[in-house]
Amino acid sequence: YYKISAIWGGHEGSLLLWVVILGGWIYAVAVKSRNLPQDIVARVLSVMGIVAVGFILFTLLTSSPFERHLPMYPQEGGDLNPLLQDIGLIIHPPMLYMGYVGFAVAFAFAIAALLSGQLDAAWARWSRPWTNVAWAFLTLGIALGSWWAYYELGWGGWWFWDPVENASFMPWLVGTALIHSLAVTEKRGVFKSWTVLLAIFTFSLSLLGTFLVRSGVLTSVHAFASDPERGYFILALLAITIGGSLLLYAIKAAHVKAESSFELVSRESFLLLNNIVLVVVALMVLLGTLYPLLLDALQMGKISVGAPYFNAMFIPLMSLLVVLMGIGAIARWKATKSEFLIKQLWLPGVLAVVVGVL
C-alpha cells in the first residue's frame, strides 16, 4: 500500500490528489443537485470548474506527475522518506484534502448566490450539508495528523503549533464559524452577508494552507514536498480567488435585503459572538504563522513564534468561547429575558467555578 500512498508523498502527487478529489466533489455536487434550480447548479459547477482549471494548469505546467525521468533514474528506485513509511500517510493526507477541497463547494454556492443576487436562506440550505461533510473530513484529517505526530519521533507531540498544523487549523476554525452561521441563515434568515464572507474566507484559508505547505516559505517539521518557485503560482491563484471574490462581494452584498431583527440578548447574538471569537482566533493563528515570514521579507531579522504566544492568546479566547456556547445553548431565538438566563445559569455557573478552583 505504500506504492499507492507514495503518490501523494511528493509535491506532484499531492497536487494530483487535490485535483482528483476536487473532481470527485464536482461529480457529487452534479449528481446530488438535480432537484435544485438549474441556473444555480450551473453557476456552482462553473465556479468549481474554474478552480479545477487553475489547479490542473498548475499541475501540468509546473508539477506534472507524469514526467518521465528515463534514463536518469535510481537503479533501485527512490525510497520513500522513512518518516512517511507509516499508515498515517495512507489516511491523513486524503482526509485533510477532502476537507480542504470540500470547502470549495460552500465557496461555489456563495459565489453563485452573489452572482444570482439570491442571498437568502435557500443557498444556505443547499450548501450546509456539503459544508458539514467537508468540516467533518477536515476534523478527521487534523485528528489523524495529531495521532500520527504523537507517536512519530521528533514531531513535538500531538500539537506543536507548527506552521503546517496551523495551515489546516485556520480553515477549520473559520469553517466551524461557517457551519454555525449557515444554520442561523437557514433557520432565521439572518447573517446573510456575513455567511457569504465566511464561505469565501474558509476556502481562501484552505488555498493559503496549500501555499504554505507546498511553497517551502515556512520551516516545518512536516515539510516533505516544497518548492518556493511553484509556490508563487499558488499565491497568484490565491490572490485571484480572494481578490475576485471580495470584489464581487463588495458589489453585490450592498444590495442584500434587510435581515430579520433580533434583540441584543438572543441566541442569534450569542452565535454571532461565537463566530467573531472563532474568526479572531483564526486571525491570531494567521498572524503568528506569517509574522516571521513578513519580518524576513522586510530584512528585519529571523524569528520564530512558538507555543508560548499561541497558548497565551488561544486559552483566554477559547475560554470565552466556551462561556458563549453555554449561554447560547440556553438563549432563545429573537429575544431572551435576562432574568430567564440568570435563573437557568446561576447554578451551573457556581458549580463550574467550584470545580475549576478545585
Give the positions of each predicted feature.
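Conserved active-site neighborhood of enzyme catalytic/cofactor-binding cores
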Residues: 131, 142-150, 156-158, 163-208, ...
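Central hydrophobic cores of alpha-helical transmembrane segments in multi-pass inner-membrane proteins
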Residues: 18-34, 105-114, 172-182, 320-328, ...
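Contiguous transmembrane helix-bundle modules in multi-pass membrane proteins
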Residues: 163-170, 220-358
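Structural signature of hydrophobic alpha-helical transmembrane segments
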Residues: 13-19, 97-100, 160-173, 214, ...
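Hydrophobic alpha-helical membrane-insertion segments
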Residues: 48-61, 198-206, 275-286
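Membrane-interface interhelical loops and short amphipathic "cap" helices
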Residues: 1-12, 64-93, 144-167, 188, ...
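Membrane-interfacial loop-to-helix junctions in multi-pass inner-membrane proteins
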Residues: 28-52, 115-136, 161, 184-200, ...
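Mature extracytoplasmic enzyme cores
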Residues: 1, 10-71, 76-77, 83, ...
